Amino acid sequence: MSNNNNEAQQPVESTNVESQQNVVQSDCPVVNENNDNNNNNNNNNNNNNNNNNNNNNNNNSNNNNNSSNNENNENNENNSCEKSEQEKPKEPEEPVQEEKSKEPCDQQKVKENEPAEEKETEPAAPVEPENPLSNDSAASEKLQEQHQQQNHEPQQTSNGESNEADANESENKKRSIDEAGDIKDGKKRKVETVETSDPAQQVEA
């Protein structure tokens, strides 16, 4: 009887162990799946982080490229501006320098030939060219009369006679006309005098 009891108990124990093993085995794959999913997620996150880092690196490199391009553009603009500035003033500078260089040379020549001090002290008298009609007595007399009126000095004619008498006569006529008051500034005017006892107190109206 005891043997039978033992035999009957053994399969119960075996079934219990099998059921426990089955439970453990059924739980294990679930845990493994979760771990796999977590690992996959972590890997994906790492990949995303790497991608983000790569993108950041790319952005940085793009920014660097943009900055270098901007610098190149500025350099190009500066170069073009410098070229245009250098080309523009070349044309007007050359004649200006030539004119400036001519002036001091001319002034130096004038100073060497005729000192400035002598020019200031000398009277500004016009130098007349030689008259080709000097042989003509009428033309020479007219020229001498013009000089006589300007300078009020007696001069000789081509015949050797002095014009001093003519000059004195014309001056006397002018004085008599001005004193009489008949003509003033080329216009005739009337002079009315108020007679008084004292001739020095006569008033001209």
UniProtKB/Swiss-Prot annotation:
Record's compositionally biased regions (Polar residues): 1-25, 194-205
Bias (Low complexity): 32-79, 123-132, 146-162
Protein name in the entry: Uncharacterized protein DDB_G0285917
Highest taxon of source: Eukaryota
Region (Disordered): 1-205
Chain intervals with Basic and acidic residues compositional bias: 80-122, 170-185
